[in-house]
Amino acid sequence: MKTETVENWLIPMGDVSFFLNPAWRAVATYNCKGMGFSTFFPENAVGVVEAKKICEGCPVQRICLEFALQNNEDHGIWGGVSERTRKKMRQTRERHLRRMAKVDAQLKQLAQ
């Protein structure tokens, strides 16, 4: 079974300024110019590979991926990553955030 790894995909929590700026979408739209909508919502493995190749080297690839993660996009290729991998990434992030919340609560208790 093939797995995919995405390095450095986390954008600092709370920093959503890039989502508010429509420029990233304009860059993505320009880079994807001429690609049909269905290109990024492929129906077979060949289409998935092709969509991922389009995302390689895109200057807003990480932002596109983070947008999909933040908005729970369950379909399509976003930032060169499949829905299955994004689901795993969200689960990992959620576990990490739960652990951080526990540590934070323990530190607050110790500080009292």
Question: Over which residues does each language-model region extend?
Answer:
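Short, surface-exposed, polar/charged, turn-prone segments marking secondary-structure boundaries
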Residues: 59-62, 68-70, 86, 104-108
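Secondary-structure transition/capping residues
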Residues: 62, 75-76, 97
